[in-house]
């Protein structure tokens, strides 16, 4: 085990997720999740050696309070002195950053500049970053951008068909997300299949509460479904994905809704939750659909159909298909969704292997198509934290 450990932080507006990793082995020594930040009942849950315990944060219910509680927990286990650097997930680096970078004042200013591109996420990342700088004094901080991997997209893939001055003036274009996951999974897929990633044309579906899909060729992103923000593309847990932009004027005129209300509705009340009227959790949707609930059945079919359609279009972007890859919480665990998606893809020569599909769950990688399929469909568990740890160690010189 290497002497120095990496702390990885992923901050949301009301949450903070953390993990302490051994960069060499990938082992997670301690993890935490702070929830309800900025509310009086804020708390943080720690997991160490398989045991969990909860700490009240009501005295300081913000990101600094959460990072402070994390420092105390590390001290209690004698791990505080072994932290060598801190890695941070940042949703948007816009066009400023095409790779991970060591933090200085200029980088913080750059992340601030990208706030309009990720107004829900980047401010929270900055709170976590500043908290880490104040509590873990003197340690190097590294930021890893969700958008960086997609900076290889060609101009015709990232440009929107609107007046070009809007791009030049405001940076209005497709940026994508989940890039750290795609970078990890494209490497792992090649390793798992025993191929060079530069020889593989991949379509990778990262399916969780937020869901996106990316075409990868020559080891690089060629196109992706998320756009200016993570709202575009697939049907998601609470996000609508693709929708006619005229919805804004239609709802403003007919439902008397403001832009802020419509944006909030499309981000937080739509997707599986909005269609089903039940839940944003795919497991609940699958269970209720099996019982015949009409809303759940429709939500599931829409999720699957939209995904299958996008696989077809991303195959064009990749220049063909050698490997279709499922990852993320839903992609790694829902054999039902994978089977039904592949049911649409017989025209691509992809045929499900039922037994293999059932085995490839709960952290198990595996090929889930038959030997006579023209390409492979494969399940590869993602590990964004490990990718962030690797970048952090490398850029910190550990």
Language-model features, listed with the residues they occupy:
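Internal helix-turn-beta structural module
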Residues: 297, 301-322, 331-398
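Short beta-strand-loop/turn "lid" adjacent to the catalytic site in phosphate-handling enzymes
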Residues: 74-121, 140-142, 148-157
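Adenine-nucleotide phosphate-binding core of ATP-dependent small-molecule kinases
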Residues: 264, 271-275, 282-317
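Catalytic phosphate/nucleotide-handling subdomain of diverse soluble enzymes
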Residues: 217, 223-255, 264, 328-360, ...
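Glycine-rich phosphate-binding loop of actin/hexokinase-like ATP-binding domains
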Residues: 151-253
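Glycine-rich beta-strand-to-loop/alpha-helix junction loops that act as flexible
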Residues: 11-12, 89-92, 207, 321, ...
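Extreme N-terminal starter segment of soluble prokaryotic enzymes
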Residues: 2-7
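Short glycine-rich, Thr/Ser-proximal phosphate-binding strand/loop in the N-terminal lobe
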Residues: 15-60, 227
């Amino acid at each position: 085990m290497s002497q120095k450990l990496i702390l990885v932080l992923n901050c949301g507006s009301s949450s903070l997720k953390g993990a302490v990793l051994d960069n060499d082995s990938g082992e997670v020594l301690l993890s935490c999740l702070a929830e309800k930040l900025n509310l009086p009942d804020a708390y943080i849950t720690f997991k160490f050696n398989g045991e969990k315990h909860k700490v009240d944060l009501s005295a300081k219910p913000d990101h600094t309070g959460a990072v402070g509680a994390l420092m105390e927990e590390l001290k209690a286990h004698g791990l505080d002195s072994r932290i060598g650097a801190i890695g941070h997930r940042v949703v948007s680096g816009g066009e400023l950053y095409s790779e991970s970078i060591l933090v200085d004042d200029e980088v913080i200013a750059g992340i601030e500049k990208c706030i309009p591109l990720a107004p829900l996420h980047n401010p929270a990342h900055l709170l976590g970053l500043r908290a880490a700088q104040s509590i873990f004094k003197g340690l190097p901080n590294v930021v890893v951008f969700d958008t960086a991997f997609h900076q290889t997209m060609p101009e015709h893939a990232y440009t929107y068909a609107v007046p070009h001055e809007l791009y030049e003036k405001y940076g209005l274009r497709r940026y994508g997300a989940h890039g750290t996951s795609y970078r990890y999974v494209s490497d792992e897929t090649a390793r798992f299949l025993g191929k060079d990633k530069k020889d593989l044309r991949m379509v990778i579906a990262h399916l969780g509460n937020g869901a996106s899909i990316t075409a990868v060729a020559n080891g690089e992103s060629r196109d992706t479904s998320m756009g200016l923000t993570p709202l575009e593309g697939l049907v998601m847990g609470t996000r609508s994905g693709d929708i006619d932009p005229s919805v804004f004027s239609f709802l403003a005129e007919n439902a008397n809704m403001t832009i802020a209300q419509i944006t909030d509705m499309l981000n937080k009340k739509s997707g599986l939750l909005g269609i089903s009227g039940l839940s944003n959790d795919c497991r609940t949707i699958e269970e209720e659909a099996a019982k015949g609930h009409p809303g759940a059945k429709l939500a599931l079919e829409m999720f699957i159909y939209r995904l299958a359609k996008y696989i077809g279009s991303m195959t064009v972007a990749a220049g063909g298909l050698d490997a279709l890859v499922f990852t993320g919480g839903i992609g790694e665990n829902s054999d039902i969704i994978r089977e039904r998606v592949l049911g649409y893809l017989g025209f691509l020569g992809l045929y499900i292997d039922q037994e293999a599909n059932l085995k490839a769950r709960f952290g198990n990688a595996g090929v889930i198509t038959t030997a006579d399929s023209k390409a492979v469909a494969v399940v590869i568990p993602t590990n964004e934290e490990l990718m962030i740890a690797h970048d952090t160690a490398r850029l910190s010189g550990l």
